[in-house]
């Protein structure tokens, strides 16, 4: 399972608006790939194409026939009128036994949350639970859409350390969608700079000198993490 996903000349249109323009790259087994780009660059759309949630308007998406994937969404909403514990949430649409759920919570240092209400969790705790739930099917590929959104720097460091830990345990491929550098460059094998089309693609060292990367993020210093300032 060397290449688990192969995207060839992918285009996505919403009406006449071009969201993704001629996207081609391969996802290799065991690699961590970060897709960087500003808001509105098509990052989440690309993630959904990879997951099969959106069909491309043109182009070809080839997946390994035995590929198992998991998705950690950017946001998840819980109805405050419906009481639900972490344990119940972990078991929704799941055939896994309680002890297995507990085991996967342990992997992300969140086993103490098992009986807590999902409504009472912090942003960082919810991300841990979502990450744990993404492991239940023992995926070959995990796609994380803006996993550190709303977390402070310390929370981001903790979550990225957990992602690195999971990568080591499962030897799976991971795609991280982001618009911030922060610690991403130190935690990834390959980087794709996206703004509807791929502006540059390669190892962090290779793309950090690329004109398109510098235009988007400024000069990257490995000793001083560059931070892309964005507006909400």
Curated annotation (Swiss-Prot):
GO MF, one annotated term: ATP binding
Phosphoprotein as a keyword?
Answer: no
What is its EC class?
translocase
Reactions accelerated catalytically: Zn(2+)(out) + ATP(in) + H2O(in) = Zn(2+)(in) + ADP(in) + phosphate(in) + H(+)(in)
Instruction: List GO BP terms, alphabetically.
Output: response to zinc ion
Name its cellular compartments.
Answer: Cell membrane
Keywords per UniProt:
ATP-binding, Cell membrane, Ion transport, Membrane, Nucleotide-binding, Translocase, Transport, Zinc, Zinc transport
Q: Where is the ABC transporter domain?
A: 5-220
GO CC annotations on file? plasma membrane
- Enzyme Commission no: 7.2.2.20
SUPFAM superfamilies on file = P-loop containing nucleoside triphosphate hydrolases (SSF52540)
The highest taxon in the source lineage is Bacteria
State the PROSITE patterns in the record: ABC_TRANSPORTER_1, ABC_TRANSPORTER_2, ZNUC
Among the Pfam families in the record, one is ABC_tran
InterPro entries linked: AAA+_ATPase (IPR003593), ABC_transporter-like_ATP-bd (IPR003439), ABC_transporter-like_CS (IPR017871), Metal_Ion_Import_ABC (IPR050153), P-loop_NTPase (IPR027417)
Could you tell me the membrane topology recorded for this protein? Peripheral membrane protein
Q: What is its main location?
A: membrane
Listed Gene3D superfamilies: P-loop containing nucleotide triphosphate hydrolases
Which residues bind ATP per the record? 37-44
How the protein assembles, per its UniProt entry? The complex is composed of two ATP-binding proteins (ZnuC), two transmembrane proteins (ZnuB) and a solute-binding protein (ZnuA).
> In UniProt terms, what function does this protein have?
Part of the ABC transporter complex ZnuABC involved in zinc import. Responsible for energy coupling to the transport system.
Give the family this protein belongs to, as stated in its UniProt record.
Answer: Belongs to the ABC transporter superfamily. Zinc importer (TC 3.A.1.15.5) family.
NCBIfam families listed in its UniProt record: PRK09544.1
The molecule here is called: Zinc import ATP-binding protein ZnuC
Q: Which organism is it from?
A: Wigglesworthia glossinidia brevipalpis
